[in-house]
């Protein structure tokens, strides 16, 4: 019987969001254990090699990371298989580049460049609010952070704006109707819209109804909803398309219009 952790990941079993060709070998890089789940993360190796094209091989990525050039959320990461996840900020100081990991409407991690000012903070979804030993209140975020003595108004499913350098909470956004959100799981992954209403189903999954800027409405589980702004103002910049998913016919019309303009 097998003992211990799994050390390999077959390429065919790797998440589709990594966009690995199935003829490129037998194995895929297995992410290290870290703040994000295997199916919800992107290894640093794939980000540098396949997305940014800064390296051709695994060996070259290791040489880059071992020079301590790559920072994730303000901390140097030398592990080439480190799991990057939703809202993580990747800094490459040598080239002066800053990236935020964010989904596109097709459910893939897009290369989203951000400014130096925006790279100083990130948004975190509150997963748990509890009281620890000696009555110390604390909360746990979606990326595994534990923050002690938070503002008592912050509840589960709210979003906090976290300053990366100091780990201080700058602001909080309530999970309320009318606030802007992004979907982080399910078939609507990557879509952006405003929360319309929520249905409570005790003993099952609460359902959240969302409307995007084009007027399309859809529903998803509460667990998949990540609040990213108050009202219609987003706290982070969004990738091209602003999280609006077009139908097949709308995509075709847009493509034909672009071709006609050329």
From Swiss-Prot:
Query: Looking at the record's lineage, which domain of life comes first?
Result: Eukaryota
Q: Name one GO cellular component term.
A: cytosolic small ribosomal subunit
Q: Which UniProt keywords apply?
A: Ribonucleoprotein, Ribosomal protein, RNA-binding, rRNA-binding
Signal sequence annotation: none
Q: Which residues form the S4 RNA-binding domain?
A: 42-104
Gene Ontology molecular functions: rRNA binding; structural constituent of ribosome
Q: Which GO terms describe its biological process?
A: translation
Q: Which PROSITE patterns match?
A: RIBOSOMAL_S4E, S4
Family as reported in the entry's similarity comment: Belongs to the eukaryotic ribosomal protein eS4 family.
Q: Which HAMAP family match?
A: Ribosomal_eS4
Q: Which PANTHER family match?
A: 30S/40S RIBOSOMAL PROTEIN S4, SMALL RIBOSOMAL SUBUNIT PROTEIN ES4
This chain belongs to the protein called Small ribosomal subunit protein eS4
